[in-house]
Structure formats: structure tokens, C-alpha cells
From Swiss-Prot:
It is found in: Nucleus; Cytoplasm, Cytoskeleton, Spindle; Chromosome, Centromere, Kinetochore. GO terms for biological process: chromosome segregation; mitotic spindle organization; regulation of cytokinesis. This is Aurora kinase. It holds the Pfam family Pkinase. The gene is IPL1. Its EC number is 2.7.11.1. It comes from the Eukaryota. The lineage of its organism: Eukaryota, Fungi, Dikarya, Ascomycota, Saccharomycotina. SMART domains: S_TKc. Residues 1-84 are annotated as: Disordered. Residues 1-15, 48-80 have a biased composition (Polar residues). Belongs to the protein kinase superfamily. Ser/Thr protein kinase family. Aurora subfamily.
Length: 371
């Protein structure tokens, strides 16, 4: 795919240029709880940029149709009240010049993420910058497009927000929610493994995020510590939707994800459904408690593959009985018999440790809504 074809393919996710360096992007307002979280970021020292967010008070978003006479200067639908990110309704033209660029927050294969502040509103976010040339040469333009299409429509406490996106001649940019503590992977490497109290909080939150995604027929397919971010009060947010897929048919057969976390149906190239994420959550729980994935082998991918398909699972004796039970229920060879995420809040391991959590379960949690 050529550079021109990449730009054309991005048109469905609002990346068409109206002017040489400025394009229109859709911006999505934060929920009140999310705004409160980002307001607290002012306590974190970040060098050049203060992370104090502008004071904004607003009600839940309502969509209102724009009069035809105003279509030339406004979008077809606008938000009421104004978006806390833009300070204006509807769409806003953006270019890189609209941001103060702060420290680098992370680096990936195709670009970097920076702490940025909107010069007009003072709103702090994370800007993911990727070179178009590298996306094309890496043959990941479809993966990037998928990430934008999926993440633009997600609103959940435990899912990283994508506020908007734009591009210029050489790069594409994603305006993302700023999460103060960064990758959970780094914390796990520093601590070697988590306490059961901490791990149970994270696994519960992941189950809520996955329930939300599965309810929208989205399979993440790449659950791992590197794709989880840590915010205030032990709140985690799942990120990196490059391997995710919107799967209305509920059955797929594409090989993807990270080898240590892949379920047997994927490594054996069999059709799979949302239960692949349940398997990966079981792997994640094991790594949280033991410091490494359960089927990881020094012998390489083939050795790991053999252990996965044989379910060669060895749980250390220091893992509690109810934790081991949950791991085994998620790591079941038959996808249909794997643990149901909707029952996570009732599992004895979660019930026993929930009073010890720093994280406070919101009233919007799946089981709270159905109570």
C-alpha cells in the first residue's frame, strides 16, 4: 500500500485534510468521573507542563441536531454542553502547533507518545505520534486504522479514551487520555509479582473492561501487562486496540496477539470467539501472582506451543487455593467451559479480597447495574 493509499484509507476515520496542515477531528467529552481523575493529575510533577486541568462543569452529553443553515460552519451533530477537551461544541481544527509538547511518555515501534497541553484550553492529554512512512513500510496501516475505528467509540472507566485524531504530511496523531502512572508492565517488573490483594483488584477491573468490550462484539486479542495502564487509586485502563476486532459473527480464525498469552484454539488455527480474552485474562492473573506467564519456555515458541495445547499448567504452592481455582477455570481447553466474566464479582477470591482494595468499584459496574 502506498502513502497515498494510506491517506485515502484513513478517510473513514476522519483523517481527511481540509487544509494542508489542519483537519477536522471529532472530539468526545469525558464522563464526570474521568474528568475528576484527570483533574487530580495536577499533583504529579511533569517538568515543562503542569497537568492541572481547566475547571469544567457539565452534565451528561446530549446530542442535538444542527440547523441546516449552520452546516457550513458546524458539524451535523454537536454536543451539549461543550466538550471539556475543546471548550467548544462539535468539531475543532487541530494541528501540532495547537499543543505545548512536554516530556516523552513512551516509545513504540512506530513512534512516540508525549505529554501535551492544548494551548487554547489548557487541557492535558497524551499525544501518540506515528510516522506514515513507517506504518506503510511495517504493513500495519490496517491495524492502525482498526485501532482508531474501535477506540473512538469506547467509553468505560477501565478503557483508555481516544479523544480525537489528526494528521499532517508526514505523521498521524492520536489524542489520548493521560494516565499518570504509565504501563503496568513496568510496575510488575519492579515488584517481580503483585500481592493477591493488588492482583485481584486488577483482574476484577480487567473483567469489567472485557465485559464492556464483548457487549459491543469487540474481542481485544492482545491482553498483556504492556497494554494496561495504571491511573490514580489503582485504577487500570486497557489500551492498544491494534489487534482488536469488531466481530459481529462471533467466530474468527486469524492468528494474532502475543505467544505466551495465546489460547490453544488460536495457536492451532481453529475458529475462536470472545473466550480467547478469558484465556488471556487467566494468563495475566498467573503472571501477576507468579511474575511470568505459565507456559513460557526458554526453548522458544515451539516449546511454549506444546505446553499450551497440552495445558501443562503448574501453579506454585504460594498461590492461594481460591486464586488457583480462578486461574484453572479461565485456563480451560474448551472455550465454552471457561469462566464467565459476568460472575467475576462473585468468585470467592474477589469477594475475600475486595475489602482490601484501594480501587473503589463504581456504581456503573456490570453487577451493580443488574442488582
Amino acid at each position: 500500500m502506498s502513502m497515498k493509499q494510506l491517506e485515502t484509507s484513513m478517510s473513514s476515520v476522519s483523517l481527511q485534510e481540509k487544509k494542508p496542515t489542519r483537519i477536522k477531528i471529532a472530539l468526545h467529552p469525558q464522563s464526570k468521573s474521568e474528568q475528576n481523575e484527570t483533574d487530580r493529575a495536577s499533583k504529579i510533577p511533569t517538568g515543562r507542563i503542569s497537568t492541572t486541568q481547566p475547571q469544567t462543569y457539565y452534565r451528561p452529553t446530549n446530542l442535538t441536531k444542527t440547523p441546516a443553515s449552520q452546516v457550513s460552519r458546524r458539524s451535523s451533530y454537536t454536543t451539549d454542553p461543550p466538550s471539556p477537551l475543546t471548550g467548544i461544541t462539535g468539531f475543532r481544527n487541530y494541528s501540532l502547533d495547537d499543543f505545548e509538547i512536554g516530556k516523552a511518555l513512551g516509545k513504540g515501534k512506530f513512534g512516540k507518545v508525549y505529554l501535551v497541553k492544548d494551548k487554547k484550553t489548557g487541557f492535558v492529554s497524551a499525544l501518540k505520534c506515528m510516522e506514515k512512512k513507517e506504518l506503510v513500510e511495517g504493513n500495519v496501516e490496517k491495524q492502525f486504522r482498526r485501532e482508531v475505528e474501535i477506540q473512538s467509540n469506547l467509553r468505560h472507566t477501565n478503557v483508555l479514551r481516544l479523544f480525537g485524531h489528526f494528521h499532517d504530511k508526514d505523521r498521524v496523531y492520536l489524542i489520548l487520555e493521560y494516565v499518570v502512572h504509565g504501563e503496568l508492565y513496568k510496575l510488575l517488573r519492579n515488584q517481580k509479582r503483585f500481592t493477591e490483594s493488588t492482583a485481584s483488584s486488577y483482574i476484577y477491573q480487567m473483567s469489567e473492561a472485557l465485559l464492556y468490550l464483548h457487549g459491543k462484539n469487540i474481542i481485544h486479542r492482545d491482553i498483556k501487562p504492556e497494554n494496561i495502564l495504571l491511573h490514580f487509586n489503582d485504577t487500570i485502563k486497557i489500551s492498544d486496540f491494534g489487534w482488536s476486532v469488531h466481530a459481529p459473527s462471533n467466530r474468527r480464525s486469524t492468528l494474532c496477539g502475543t505467544m505466551d498469552y495465546l489460547p490453544p484454539e488460536i495457536v492451532q488455527s481453529r475458529p475462536y470467539d470472545k473466550n480467547v480474552d478469558v484465556w488471556s485474562l487467566g494468563i495475566l492473573m498467573y503472571e501477576f501472582l507468579c511474575g511470568a506467564p505459565p507456559f513460557e519456555e526458554p526453548g522458544g515458541a515451539q516449546a511454549t506451543y506444546r505446553r499450551i495445547v497440552k495445558l501443562d499448567l503448574r501453579i506454585p504452592p504460594y498461590v492461594s487455593a481460591d486464586a488457583a481455582d480462578l486461574i484453572k477455570r479461565m485456563l480451560t481447553l474448551d472455550p465454552a467451559k471457561r469462566f464467565k466474566l459476568k460472575d467475576m464479582h462473585k468468585h470467592p477470591w474477589i469477594v475475600r479480597l475486595r475489602p482490601t482494595w484501594k480501587y473503589k468499584v463504581p456504581k456503573t459496574a456490570s453487577h451493580e447495574r443488574s442488582a
